[in-house]
Amino acid sequence: MKVTLIAILTCAAVLVLHTTAAEELKTESQLMEVGMPDTELATVDEERLFKCSVSCEIEKESNKDCKKKKCKGGWKCKFNMCVKV
């Protein structure tokens, strides 16, 4: 009786884990289809970081504070980097 109960509980646990993993994969695949590919996102982030760093360095040479307005679209310049607000 104990062996049967253990076997049933083990199968139930495996089924739950398998179902959860399948749902996560489905969600990930849907997210990847909707948005931009990761490589394009990385390129956009690198461009924002570069523009912000360059503009901050130019302003620092002139003894001015970094303007927070250089980064757009929900980003702000902080520590010479564009960070998501």
Curated annotation (Swiss-Prot):
Major place of residence: secreted
The keyword Disulfide bond is assigned to this record: yes
Location in the cell: Secreted
Prodomain residues: 23-48
Entries under InterPro entries matching the protein: Hwtx-2-like (IPR012625)
Signal sequence range: 1-22
One term under GO cellular component: host cell postsynaptic membrane
Presence of the UniProt keyword Secreted in the record: yes
The entry's keywords: Disulfide bond, Neurotoxin, Postsynaptic neurotoxin, Secreted, Signal, Toxin
Top-level taxon in the UniProt lineage: Eukaryota
Cysteine disulfide links: C52-C66, C56-C77, C71-C82
Tissue: Expressed by the venom gland.
Gene Ontology MF terms in the entry: toxin activity
Family statement: Belongs to the neurotoxin 12 (Hwtx-2) family. 02 (Hwtx-2) subfamily.
UniProt function note: Postsynaptic neurotoxin.
Protein's name in the database: U4-theraphotoxin-Hhn1ad
Organism: Cyriopagopus hainanus (Chinese bird spider)
Upper taxonomic lineage: Eukaryota, Metazoa, Ecdysozoa, Arthropoda, Chelicerata
